[in-house]
Amino acid sequence: MQKMSSIPNVIFILCDIANNIELLNSTFDKKKFDVVLSDMAPKACGNKQVDHANIINLCEMSLEIAVKFIKPNGIFITKILQGEYEKEFYQSVKYHFNSVKYFKPKASRKDSSEMYLVSLGFKENLEYI
């Protein structure tokens, strides 16, 4: 995990998200946010399929958090790698948001499968799938 410099009006929690859902629940109890942004990435092992599966797992956790804590019409942005489970995850995000688009930053290498999903218009009152 990498530390991050503080940013005004941004709450930053450095933790293992897989083991600290309760920390998030207690910290943000009943609070809702305009944006949930996930730049999480697992440590790469070099096997593209394993690396892809690991980042999709993090994406699913970040989506679950977004669905719980985001305001109606809110924004969810998450880092993703192209691969076998990408379309299924895209459909899960599309279920919860009105618009979902891929974005590849100019700083990203052209041969990299790293992208971001930018999701706008959170649909409130849908159960997490």
UniProtKB/Swiss-Prot annotation:
MF annotations from Gene Ontology: rRNA (uridine-2'-O-)-methyltransferase activity
The UniProt keyword set, sorted, is: Cytoplasm, Methyltransferase, rRNA processing, S-adenosyl-L-methionine, Transferase
EC code(s) of this entry: 2.1.1.166
The protein's location, in the record's own words, is: Cytoplasm
Q: Which superkingdom is the protein from?
A: Bacteria
Gene3D superfamilies assigned to the protein according to its UniProt record, in alphabetical order: Vaccinia Virus protein VP39
Q: Which cellular component, as a GO term, is one annotated location? A: cytoplasm
Q: Does the keyword rRNA processing apply?
A: yes
Q: Which Pfam families match?
A: FtsJ (PF01728)
Q: Which Cys residues form disulphide pairs?
A: none
Q: Which parts of the chain span the membrane according to its record? A: none
Catalytic activity, reaction form: uridine(2552) in 23S rRNA + S-adenosyl-L-methionine = 2'-O-methyluridine(2552) in 23S rRNA + S-adenosyl-L-homocysteine + H(+)
Q: What class of enzyme is it?
A: transferase
Q: Where is the active site?
A: K79 (proton acceptor)
Q: Which PANTHER family match?
A: RIBOSOMAL RNA METHYLTRANSFERASE (PTHR10920), RRNA METHYLTRANSFERASE 2, MITOCHONDRIAL (PTHR10920:SF18)
User: What's the family?
Assistant: Belongs to the class I-like SAM-binding methyltransferase superfamily. RNA methyltransferase RlmE family.
Biological role: Specifically methylates the uridine in position 2552 of 23S rRNA at the 2'-O position of the ribose in the fully assembled 50S ribosomal subunit.
- Name of the protein in its database record: Ribosomal RNA large subunit methyltransferase E
Write down the species.
Answer: Ehrlichia ruminantium (strain Gardel)
